[in-house]
């Protein structure tokens, strides 16, 4: 199989300073540290106090430029995956572009909820295809604490804020390569995970609707979706790439819930050895979760050049996206 050049030049991650441990949540709702850890694997989460999604993403973009040795004017594209933008418009990517002075970069946002970063990988992969080498920043960033009802323990215990990203290029900079990808949307199940309903309050509305800003989730439906669809998607990309499970060095999964990841690992390999996790530190950060984990593994020298990585995101939409690449 001929692999296409798809190189990660640098990784970066940022989380707000404010940490909310489970013990603090017990003062806000009827719950306990034991209850949260047993059901989710989460011990704490980071939350913003004044920062916005664009601020988190800008910090990541600045780190990416520093670590890659690139100038802002070297960037051709900026793609931000988020479900918690500052505004309906401008896009977070446009705000980042302006903040870092990437004057020639085309900027766009992707909203595929918790699948957003992996959807963004496919968008960037397509953007970079062409005759001349191009370079892009791909960032997943979220301030989900703004979408949480902090009295609803079914959702409040899950989510955190943060951002992570990568510099991607089609130049022959490293040994990186795109291997295979699989993307699916099950819109008929979208009602099982919603957030940020805008409402309808126009004077011309025949049926005014209230604003519903907070997460609403059918946890059982989402759990069953994940443990069924993620292994199926991973098997499809392995087949496309003519790879065995043992050919993958690490499976970088959306950090939705420790129990979900354990079930997926048991299904695919029978072991957590290839499935690193950091949900205990950060909670579910939606589109930020995979790049935050990837950055941790790269900066701690766990992931090395030439490693084969399978990234999979899943969540609202309902959506799932999986890509295998060589780092």
Curated annotation (Swiss-Prot):
Listed GO MF terms: 3-oxoacyl-[acyl-carrier-protein] synthase activity; beta-ketoacyl-acyl-carrier-protein synthase III activity
Record keywords: Acyltransferase, Cytoplasm, Fatty acid biosynthesis, Fatty acid metabolism, Lipid biosynthesis, Lipid metabolism, Multifunctional enzyme, Transferase
GO cellular component: a single term: cytoplasm
Active-site residues, Swiss-Prot/TrEMBL: 114, 254, 284
One Pfam family here: ACP_syn_III
Spans annotated as ACP-binding: 255-259
InterPro entries: ACP_syn_III_C (IPR013747), ACP_syn_III_N (IPR013751), FabH (IPR004655), Thiolase-like (IPR016039)
Compartment list: Cytoplasm
CDD domains in UniProt: KAS_III
Coiled coil location: none
Pathway noted in the entry: Lipid metabolism; fatty acid biosynthesis
One Gene Ontology term from the biological process aspect of the record: secondary metabolite biosynthetic process
Record field: catalytic activity: malonyl-[ACP] + acetyl-CoA + H(+) = 3-oxobutanoyl-[ACP] + CO2 + CoA
The enzyme's E.C. designation: 2.3.1.180
Family designation: Belongs to the thiolase-like superfamily. FabH family.
Domain notes: The last Arg residue of the ACP-binding site is essential for the weak association between ACP/AcpP and FabH.
Assembly, per entry: Homodimer.
Matching NCBIfam families: fabH, PRK09352.1
Job of this protein: Catalyzes the condensation reaction of fatty acid synthesis by the addition to an acyl acceptor of two carbons from malonyl-ACP. Catalyzes the first condensation reaction which initiates fatty acid synthesis and may therefore play a role in governing the total rate of fatty acid production. Possesses both acetoacetyl-ACP synthase and acetyl transacylase activities. Its substrate specificity determines the biosynthesis of branched-chain and/or straight-chain of fatty acids.
UniProt protein name: Beta-ketoacyl-[acyl-carrier-protein] synthase III
Gene name per UniProt: fabH
């Amino acid at each position: 199989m001929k692999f296409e050049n798809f190189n990660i030049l640098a990784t970066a991650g940022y989380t707000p300073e404010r940490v909310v441990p489970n013990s603090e949540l017990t003062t806000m709702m009827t719950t306990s540290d034991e209850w949260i850890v047993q059901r989710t694997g989460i011990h704490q989460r980071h939350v913003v106090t004044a920062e916005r999604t664009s601020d988190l993403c800008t910090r990541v973009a600045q780190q990416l430029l520093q670590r890659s040795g690139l100038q802002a004017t070297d960037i051709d594209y900026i793609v931000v995956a988020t479900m918690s933008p500052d505004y309906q418009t401008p896009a977070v990517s446009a705000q980042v572009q302006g903040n870092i002075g990437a004057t020639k970069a085309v900027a766009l946002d992707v909203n595929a909820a918790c699948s957003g970063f992996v959807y963004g990988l496919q968008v960037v992969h397509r953007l970079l295809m062409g005759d001349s080498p191009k370079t892009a920043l791909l960032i997943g960033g979220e301030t989900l604490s703004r979408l949480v009802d902090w009295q609803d323990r079914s959702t409040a215990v899950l989510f955190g804020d943060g951002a992570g990203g990568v510099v991607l290029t089609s130049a022959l900079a490293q040994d990186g390569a795109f291997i295979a990808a699989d993307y699916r949307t099950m819109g008929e199940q979208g009602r099982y995970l919603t957030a940020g309903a805008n409402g309808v309050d126009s004077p011309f509305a025949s049926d005014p609707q209230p604003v519903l800003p907070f997460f609403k989730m059918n946890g059982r439906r989402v759990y069953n979706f994940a443990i069924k669809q993620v292994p199926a998607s991973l098997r499809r990309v392995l087949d496309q790439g003519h790879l065995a499970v043992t050919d993958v060095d690490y499976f970088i999964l959306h950090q939705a819930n420790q129990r979900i990841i354990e079930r997926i690992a048991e299904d695919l390999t029978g072991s957590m050895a290839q499935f690193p996790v950091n949900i205990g530190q950060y909670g579910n950060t939606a589109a930020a979760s995979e790049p935050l984990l990837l950055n941790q593994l790269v900066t701690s020298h766990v992931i090395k050049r030439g490693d084969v990585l399978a990234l999979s995101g899943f969540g609202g939409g309902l959506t799932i996206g999986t890509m295998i690449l060589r780092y």
